[in-house]
């Protein structure tokens, strides 16, 4: 058969790619009061700014079931599971517990994507393409690790209060984002969200976003991802500017943030991911 790649729903990859490459996706959970929503499975309107809206990782049992099915599909070739940053979610740790429960440390290899959203999706894509090309378990794992280490991610959010409330951003960084400036620019550094810049207007924030992506891409080919939450026009503008400034872009993916990330980023958020060298 072939190595099978597993991820969580934060990866934000289009359904056609998931199907084409045989990627197994485990849903994250959004909790609205006493109601639990499985991202990508259950439909329910969500007020992302509401105080009673939170998120949770898949359980070790859910991940164990997904890994077991993926192992069956691989017919012994093995599984590479790529999950969102362990600094941002308990998903990776739940995956590690699942692997322990399965006694499958040599056949199910875990990768911390050091990101979320397409910053998880790109390492997944690199791994799945390597697997589709006949890569060994070790080669598929290394493809994911390289993509995770090489990607650079930047965000513009309207306010940082939701990130701070959810524990994804320090109180100090949140203060700068909510009190002193109107539009903070954030970046992911080793899987952790940090404040990168402080600007007064949304247009200046997007200019910083594009400049950061251009610097990260360098002169060679690169894959670019643009994500947003209810900000399609802004995402299209950013994408157009990136295409103009980075003619060497190998591929571009545009996606809306799923509910589990939207709860923390808030309406109007726009993110850009750059992976120099592309996704394989």
Annotate the PLM regions.
Residues 53-60, 81-92, 113-117, 130:
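Short gly/ser-rich anion-binding loops that grip negatively charged ligand groups
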Residues 4, 10-24, 29-33, 78, ...:
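Mixed-charge interfacial surface used for oligomerization/domain docking
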Residues 3-65, 69:
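N-terminal glycine-rich anion-binding loop in soluble enzyme alpha/beta folds
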Residues 61-99:
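Active-site cofactor/cluster-binding pocket
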């Amino acid at each position: 058969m072939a190595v099978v790649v597993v991820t969580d729903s934060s990866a934000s990859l289009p359904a056609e790619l998931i199907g084409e490459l045989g990627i197994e996706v485990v849903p994250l959970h959004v909790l609205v009061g006493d109601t639990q929503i499985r991202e990508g499975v259950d439909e329910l309107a969500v007020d992302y700014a509401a105080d009673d809206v939170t998120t949770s990782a898949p359980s070790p049992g859910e991940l164990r079931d997904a890994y077991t099915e993926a192992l069956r599909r691989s017919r012994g070739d093995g599984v590479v599971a790529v999950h969102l940053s362990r600094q941002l979610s308990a998903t990776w740790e739940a995956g590690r517990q699942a692997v322990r429960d399965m006694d499958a440390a040599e056949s199910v290899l875990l990768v911390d994507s050091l990101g979320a959203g397409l910053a998880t999706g790109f390492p997944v894509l690199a791994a799945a393409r390597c697997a589709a090309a006949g890569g060994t378990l070790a080669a598929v794992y290394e493809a994911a690790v390289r993509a995770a280490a090489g990607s650079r991610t930047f965000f513009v959010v309207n306010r940082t209060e939701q990130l701070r409330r959810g524990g994804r951003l320090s109180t100090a960084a949140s203060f700068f984002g909510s009190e002193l400036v109107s539009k903070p620019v954030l970046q992911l550094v080793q899987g952790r969200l940090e404040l990168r810049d402080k600007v007064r207007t949304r247009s200046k924030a997007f200019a910083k976003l594009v400049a950061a992506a251009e610097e990260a891409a360098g002169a060679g080919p690169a894959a670019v991802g643009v994500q947003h939450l209810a900000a399609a026009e802004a995402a299209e503008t950013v994408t157009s500017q990136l295409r103009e400034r980075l003619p060497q872009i190998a591929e571009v993916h545009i996606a809306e943030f799923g509910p589990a990330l939207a709860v923390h980023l808030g309406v109007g958020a726009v993110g850009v991911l750059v992976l120099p060298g592309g996704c394989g």
